[in-house]
């Protein structure tokens, strides 16, 4: 082996690295653009770009000293830096959530440990004003050795943290050669078991910094308001190169470039007072510009003046109670993997701002350093998480008989093992030291799912002593094994993952001395989450509940190109023949891999809208509104638009922009005048929409921030079109009858309907020589399981809800009052099992072909709750024009419809498909008055006296159940029209609590009625 085995040595976490410091880019002058153009600094030299690269399947296969000067790399390929080598045909992709991808035998990793040799040359000219040169790696997975001009520079690990080396003595004027050996695994990999694809390489920028011989090495800015929250106090602690202080000046400028504070310094501290300070918060992210100037160097940074603290279990920022409406964010892209460019992170943040997200947890490692400058600038509260996760230790083979044994077993291998204390604390320090000057960072998190013990007690102690101005977080602190008493004195928050609402209420009492935070909740996997509104209500009704972070931001996937038909192909766990893997559990984001929003993100946006309507009095013409923002007055942020919808159609609209009317302080409520014309009859609603008042960096003027639909009473509160369609059809006809043991055919000159006496449903329906059914009608209790059904799915399949058949017993038919009435007793059952439910189905056929169905069902209570109950019709695919009046335009369910409103919408069955990468139930619409599907000749409408749910699709639920990827789906050749009494809610039980009882389809007695009305066009 050509390198020492530091990669399996707890005593050598780093070799020759510089002490940790805050991130900044020095220059010879003030920098105006700290994020987008850091290369403008004359002291910054980017080494990212094309490198020579060779892949080895094992570090033991590296025989030649490729790092020597003049080594022939002509046989090497070219690879971009930053990147991950799995995306360039080397090794293989692997997604695993908890389980380690190698045997659990720390500090050892497999001999078959892949590695990559990187080499590049660059030109260098020594700067007399800045002769010292430092080499920075912002992210390398998992560990690396580095050489300059053939000489060993050093070694480092901790994939998502910066490693800096002094290379002054290794550089020469002219051509220089840098060589890096990156290993896939090292002893640090036991602490990097995050839920993600496992990728390797130099995945963040590499650069050189030229610096003076003497000067600032590090600085720590503490900028907080005074007790009155009117003025600001800025304190800067400076660490000097070689410990030798220099003279310099510190200047603070406001956003108009006015000098607001200045101080000369020649020691270790700087103090500045800011009168009438603008305080930083996520709604008004005001930043001052700090300029630190010493001989030969200028450091430019941004400063936000703010204070975060907890008191009596309540979280405060600048003395104001705040709530986190947050998300967990991984670095993930289907093409570039972990390598996330500035443009990519800006796109993420733009979409977040568009959807009312105000907080980010950097799950589960620090982001690239410039990300935090964007968080400061755009306004996000950040939980900055250290690169610590050892979840795989939970999976080691053991026999547990109690919670205490489980926790003890998980704790003992790493979290409560002193051997890992140095590594755990090191990872925390590297996170905290680098990001300590970022005002957006309000909470330090020690890591994720590592269990608890002495290692994290030490990390928390160091963090709190080093930075008492911020709060500390670590969810796994709750995994304790009695009777050992753990030290929680340095932990500021009580944190949970995926608690139920009832658990939260209980724990708010039990642990009420600390703010309660959900570091993960409402698992956004596939079609979901479905219970956001319930969590919102609890978050904003409990002072000690400071909010939460949705799991998670984006679907993780690998771009595999396109099919022959042009369909996009994304791969997830198991698609690369890897072991172990966790399937599509990585497809759990609010956005698709390409950042197209899921309907779950649309739901989040409107649940967390900045303003809510709390009441409307149509008689008085008054609207009561509440400002849910924490700092901003409504008049400065938004304007109000409104529409009156009657039977789904807009009848009136207007705007309120008067600042006097919209004068509403944060957290306050008021009533304003808003008179509308209310019809005598019809289903009427007032839709209030909030729009961005003034453009920001990411949101344009008039951008929609959220909306509210308020029902307005009329005399009948009924949709008049539905009411008209529900009238008894006029006219009479002479019915023709044809009946045998199996079928009953009822016909007139206008239609011919064939009824299957074995099923109690129609086999064929022909209206005006137009077939209405491609296949026999069905009673339907199955849905293609959503990802959030992943647990109950097994229960449903054990009950064989996916294999049901309908059996009719006795059928009675008669012609009476100008119509035909058919009554059949029936049951639904599955092979080898007893009846699931039984009841009576009644059909009434009118002379114009209109058909009413009344279904009564009694479910055997021994069976589990149902996925759905309703009718399934297979219409010819020519019935492709959809019109409906109900909750739209996006999919909606009983617990997931805040992004929808009642209107009349036009679409097609193909457009209704919400194209989840793993196919599942999608595209349903809740609370509908009617739904019509039309061909160029005829239309079939479903309408009811009560509202119903429906779904129109080109795919069957069987196809959606069976196929593993969306690109595998094949249209069935029909338009599948599901008309449902109800569907079960969506919830978030893929990694969370069971679906709330009120959203379950748990009734054992069901009565459902709907009318099917065909018409010629």
Predicted regions and their residues:
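Accessory beta-strand-rich segments of carbohydrate-active enzymes
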Residues: 3-14, 37-38, 52-56, 86-92, ...
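Intrinsically disordered, low-complexity Pro/Gly/Ser/Thr-rich segments with frequent PxxP/GP/PP motifs
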Residues: 269-275, 648-681
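Extended acidic/polar, glycine-enriched regions
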Residues: 172-175, 239-311, 680-723, 730
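Surface beta-strand/loop "capping" patches
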Residues: 213-243, 599-638, 726-741, 855
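Beta-strand/loop-rich accessory regions of lumenal/periplasmic or secreted enzymes
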Residues: 87-89, 184, 281, 675-681, ...
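Extended substrate-binding grooves/exosites of carbohydrate-active enzymes
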Residues: 1-39, 88, 96, 151, ...
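An acidic-aromatic loop/edge-strand motif
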Residues: 87, 92, 99-108, 157, ...
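Beta-strand-rich binding/interaction modules
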Residues: 148, 231-264, 622-655, 672-673, ...
């Amino acid at each position: 082996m050509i390198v020492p085995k530091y990669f399996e040595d707890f005593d050598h976490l780093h070799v020759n690295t510089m002490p940790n410091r805050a991130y900044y880019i020095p220059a010879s002058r003030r920098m105006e653009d700290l994020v987008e153009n850091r290369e403008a600094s004359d002291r910054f030299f980017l080494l990212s770009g094309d490198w020579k690269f060779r892949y080895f399947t094992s570090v033991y296969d590296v025989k030649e000293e490729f790092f020597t000067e003049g080594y022939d790399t002509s046989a090497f390929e070219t690879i971009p830096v930053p990147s991950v080598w799995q995306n360039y045909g080397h090794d293989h992709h692997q997604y695993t959530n908890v389980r380690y991808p190698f045997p659990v035998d720390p500090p050892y990793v497999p001999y078959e440990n892949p590695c990559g040799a990187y080499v590049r040359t660059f030109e260098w000219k020594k700067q007399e004003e800045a002769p010292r040169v430092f080499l920075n790696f912002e992210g390398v997975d998992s560990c690396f050795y580095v050489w300059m001009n053939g000489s060993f520079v050093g070694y480092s690990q901790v994939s998502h943290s910066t490693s800096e080396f002094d290379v002054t003595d290794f550089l020469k004027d002219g051509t220089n050669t840098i060589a890096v050996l990156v290993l896939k695994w090292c002893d640090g990999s036991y602490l990097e078991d995050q839920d993600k694809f496992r990728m390797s390489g130099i995945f963040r920028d590499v650069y050189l910094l030229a610096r003076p011989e003497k000067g600032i090495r590090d600085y720590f800015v503490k900028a907080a308001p005074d007790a009155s929250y009117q003025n600001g106090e800025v304190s800067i602690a400076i660490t000097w190169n070689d410990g030798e202080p220099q003279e310099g000046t510190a200047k603070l400028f406001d956003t108009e470039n006015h000098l607001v504070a200045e101080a000369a310094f020649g020691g270790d501290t700087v103090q500045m007072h800011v009168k009438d300070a603008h305080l930083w918060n996520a709604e008004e992210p005001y930043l001052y510009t700090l300029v630190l100037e010493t001989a030969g160097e200028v450091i430019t940074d941004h400063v936000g003046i703010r204070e975060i603290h907890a008191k009596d279990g309540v979280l405060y920022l600048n003395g104001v109670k705040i709530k986190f409406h947050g998300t967990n964010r991984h670095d993930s892209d289907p093409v570039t993997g972990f390598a996330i460019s500035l443009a990519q992170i800006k796109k993420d943040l733009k979409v977040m701002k568009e959807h009312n997200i105000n907080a980010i947890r950097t799950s589960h490692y620090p982001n690239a350093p410039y990300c935090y400058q964007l968080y400061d600038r755009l306004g996000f509260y950040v939980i900055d998480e250290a690169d610590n996760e050892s979840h795989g230790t939970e999976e080691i083979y053991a026999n547990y008989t109690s919670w205490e044994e489980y926790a003890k077993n998980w704790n003992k291998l790493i979290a409560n093992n002193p051997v890992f204390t140095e590594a755990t604390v090191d990872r925390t320090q590297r996170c905290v030291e680098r990001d300590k000057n970022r005002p957006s960072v309000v909470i330090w998190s020690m890591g994720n799912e590592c269990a608890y013990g002495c290692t994290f007690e030490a990390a928390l102690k160091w963090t709190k002593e080093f930075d008492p101005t911020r709060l500390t977080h670590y969810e796994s602190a709750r995994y304790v094994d009695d009777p050992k008493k753990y030290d929680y004195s340095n932990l500021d928050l009580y944190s949970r993952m995926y608690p139920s609402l009832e658990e939260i209420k209980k724990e708010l009492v039990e642990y009420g001395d600390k703010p309660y935070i959900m570091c993960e909740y409402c698992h956004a996997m596939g079609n979901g989450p479905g219970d956001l509104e319930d969590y919102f209500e609890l978050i904003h009704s409990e002072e000690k509940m400071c909010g939460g972070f949705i799991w998670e931001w984006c679907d993780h996937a690998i771009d595999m190109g396109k099919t022959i038909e042009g369909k996009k192909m994304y791969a997830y766990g198991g698609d690369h023949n890897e072991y172990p893997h966790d399937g599509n559990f990585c497809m759990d984001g609010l956005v698709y891999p390409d950042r197209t929003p899921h309907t779950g993100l649309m739901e989040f946006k409107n649940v967390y809208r900045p303003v809510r309507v709390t009441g409307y009095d149509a008689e008085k013409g008054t609207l009561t509104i509440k400002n849910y923002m924490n700092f901003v007055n409504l008049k400065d942020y938004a304007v109000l638009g409104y529409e009156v919808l009657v039977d789904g159609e807009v009848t009136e609209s207007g705007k309120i922009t008067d600042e006097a009317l919209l004068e509403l302080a944060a957290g306050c409520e008021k009533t304003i005048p808003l008179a509308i014309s209310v019809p005598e009859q019809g289903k009427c609603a007032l839709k209030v929409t909030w729009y961005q008042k003034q453009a920001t960096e990411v949101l344009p003027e008039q951008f929609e921030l959220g909306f509210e639909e308020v029902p307005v009473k009329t005399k009948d509160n009924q949709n008049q079109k539905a009411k008209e369609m529900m009238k008894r059809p006029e006219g009479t006809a002479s019915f023709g009858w044809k009946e045998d043991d199996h079928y009953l055919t009822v016909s007139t000159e206008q239609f011919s309907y064939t009824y299957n006496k074995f099923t109690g449903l129609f086999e064929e329906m022909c209206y005006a020589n137009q077939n209405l059914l491609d296949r026999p009608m069905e009673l339907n209790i199955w849905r293609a399981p959503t990802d959030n059904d992943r647990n109950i799915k097994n229960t449903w399949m054990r009950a064989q809800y996916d294999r049901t058949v309908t059996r009719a017993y006795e059928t009675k038919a008669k012609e009476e009052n100008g119509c035909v009435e058919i009554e059949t007793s029936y049951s639904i059952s599955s092979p080898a099992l007893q009846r699931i439910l039984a009841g009576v189905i009644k059909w009434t056929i009118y002379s114009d072909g209109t058909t009413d169905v009344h279904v009564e069902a009694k479910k055997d209570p021994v069976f589990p709750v149902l996925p759905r109950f309703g009718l399934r019709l297979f219409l010819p695919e020519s019935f492709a024009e959809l019109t409906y009046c109900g909750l739209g335009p996006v999919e909606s369910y009983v617990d997931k419809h805040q992004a929808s409103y009642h209107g009349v919408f036009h679409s097609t069955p193909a457009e209704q498909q919400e194209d989840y990468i793993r196919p599942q139930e999608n595209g349903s619409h809740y609370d509908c008055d009617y739904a019509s599907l039309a061909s160029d000749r005829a239309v079939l409408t479903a309408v009811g006296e009560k509202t119903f749910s429906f779904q129109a699709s080109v795919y069957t639920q069987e196809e959606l159940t069976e196929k593993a990827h969306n690109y595998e789906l094949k249209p069935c050749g029909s338009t599948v029209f599901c008309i449902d009494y109800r569907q079960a809610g969506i919830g978030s039980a893929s990694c969370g609590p069971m679906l709330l009882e009120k959203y379950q389809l748990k009734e054992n007695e069901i009565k459902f009625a709907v009318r099917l009305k065909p018409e010629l066009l």
